[in-house]
Amino acid sequence: MPSFSGQFSSALRYEQYLATGTQEQQRRWMQVYDVAQLDATQQQLIAGFQREMKILVHSGIWCGDCVEQCPVIQRIAEANPAKIDLRFLEREVNTELDEELRINGGSRVPVVRFFSEDGLWCATAGDRTLNRYRALALKRLGPSCPTGILPPEKGEVEATLADWLNEVERVQLMLRLTPRLREKHQD
């Protein structure tokens, strides 16, 4: 996989990215952000992260799936900003990545890529977590895309948060256990 360090350095932090949306889009994102809360155990887990990680989200400010997942990822990142550096790239502006980030043959968002402290690719996840797919399967079939107009139910947000936290923790453990970084940090 090619290096995306240039994209990362030009990507936006959450607040900057949110500001690119319309007032209505911002409202939708904030609804989910307000519902997404880490419990004490989750906060303690994230606070214990020892390796720096970079998370780059290829997103669409207009996208219902992004509305329902990206604020959750922000909640995780802000629980340990010294170790988690989260940035966003707008799909409509950064079309050069479309071919490389296709999922199941389609241009989908969000696509979340995880990098080590020194910019090496570790993992890619997207466009929906397992619990997001389960919730959508219960609600509908067909080609329509969620609009994000109605906020997801609290239990759905909690399940999505747990899915993303599992992925972030998996990558953190990968970084913590890799011989290359253990040697570098002498631990």
Language-model-detected regions and their locations in the chain:
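Non-globular targeting/processing and membrane-anchoring segments
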Residues: 1-52, 75-82, 98-108, 121-187
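Thiol-based oxidoreductase modules, predominantly thioredoxin-like and allied folds used
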Residues: 56-59, 73, 81-97, 108, ...
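Conserved redox-active cysteine motifs that mediate thiol-disulfide chemistry
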Residues: 61-68
